[in-house]
Amino acid sequence: MAKAKFERTKPHVNIGTIGHVDHGKTSLTAAITIVLAKTGGAQATAYDQIDAAPEEKERGITISTAHVEYETQNRHYAHVDCPGHADYVKNMITGAAQMDGAILVVSAADGPMPQTREHILLAKQVGVPAMVVFLNKIDMVDDPDLLELVEMEVRELLSKYGFPGDEIPIIKGSALQALEGKPEGEKAINELMDAVDSYIPQPVRATDKPFLMPIEDVFSISGRGTVVTGRVESGIIKVGEEIEIVGLKDTQKTTCTGVEMFRKLLDEGQAGDNVGILLRGTKREEVERGQVLAKPGSIKPHDKFEAEVYVLSKEEGGRHTPFTNDYRPQFYFRTTDVTGTIKLSADKQMVMPGDNATFTVELIKPIAMQEGLKFSIREGGRTVGAGVVTKINN
């Protein structure tokens, strides 16, 4: 069956369902597509199609993720749903599925459970900006007082982890009733999508952020100077603009005197472009892979940070043994490896393969970084973990 082509005229938002196992994340995902299909905003996707999520590799880690897309009156959404808890942990830490917002699914019959807490905490750690709650399975609860109690618990839990628990929209409904085509089931799905439309903020587009380009290669072109190449991560660079070279050494200022793409000269390079940038007065040996070009003052180099990390299991090709305090692997940021030392918190003796953990890292050289930056942990050239910078300590 040919895929319906979506008009890209509406603003795009990436979203995902999170929450405890068996609380109805996949049923809800299916219900959204089935309800929106009635107005032509989606291709109806059955539970089984979503549940049989294909495996993907992201930074050497295998993750099962299902992707569906749909649109409301106002927006176009790409929605991710994961079959297993471990897939969520990996997904959120590696940023395999970037989430601009999340739908937290909580079963009204059970209330918040351990993974509900863990997913809220992870969402906070990795910087998911906002979430909306779907209180599912209300057809299994007869007592309105119980519903109210569960709602209060969810709000308290959200507040505890730094989300605005009092403001977050909580929609009550039953994904099952929506799948069965019952009017009250469909009404709840429409209410949920209205809440997602209005409450999840529109993400800032990459081109509107400050200019940043990780340096992949450096050449010197006789008579013209030094050219650095890479893919522009964010923002726009125009010929004649002043830029900084950040990371590994002291920050240097320089000027962009040319932007080249596919051997053609351009006036500017923007997010997503693979470009060569000619730098005025910069010597070949002053720049290296692993540094970044950036808008002056927009990013600083740091060597100490806190991170949320997923450690690969033995089956995933990771370590066979746990690591302890003062473990010294390589940290791969953007385009280069830097050695660093891991400091575990006082209450943690070791980290087991297959676990996720929070710890502090001290690098031997500073890297241009901001909160939310993703990295891999490598040992002898193989990936043993993936992480995200949650806090910079300097």
UniProtKB/Swiss-Prot annotation:
NCBIfam families for the chain: EF-Tu, PRK00049.1, PRK12735.1, PRK12736.1, small_GTP
Annotated segments matching region G1: 19-26
Keywords, ordered alphabetically: Cytoplasm, Elongation factor, GTP-binding, Hydrolase, Magnesium, Metal-binding, Nucleotide-binding, Protein biosynthesis
InterPro entries: EF-Tu_GTP-bd, EF-Tu_GTPase, EFTu-like_2, EFTU_2, G_TR_CS, P-loop_NTPase, Small_GTP-bd, T_Tr_GTP-bd_dom
EC annotation from Swiss-Prot or TrEMBL: 3.6.5.3
Family: Belongs to the TRAFAC class translation factor GTPase superfamily. Classic translation factor GTPase family. EF-Tu/EF-1A subfamily.
Stretch list, region G5: 174-176
Cellular component GO terms, alphabetical: cytoplasm
Enzyme class, UniProt record, top EC level: hydrolase
Chemical reaction(s) catalysed: GTP + H2O = GDP + phosphate + H(+)
Name this protein carries in UniProt: Elongation factor Tu
Binding residues for Mg(2+): T26
Role: GTP hydrolase that promotes the GTP-dependent binding of aminoacyl-tRNA to the A-site of ribosomes during protein biosynthesis.
Main location: cytoplasm
Residue ranges of the region described as G4: 136-139
GO MF term set: GTP binding; GTPase activity; guanosine tetraphosphate binding; translation elongation factor activity
Region G2: start-end pairs: 60-64
Occurrences of domain tr-type G (ranges): 10-204
Region (G3): 81-84
Gene3D superfamilies reported in the protein's UniProt record: P-loop containing nucleotide triphosphate hydrolases, Translation factors
Highest taxon above the source species: Bacteria
Residues engaged in binding GTP: 19-26, 81-85, 136-139
Presence of the UniProt keyword Magnesium in the record: yes
Quaternary structure and interacting proteins, as annotated: Monomer.
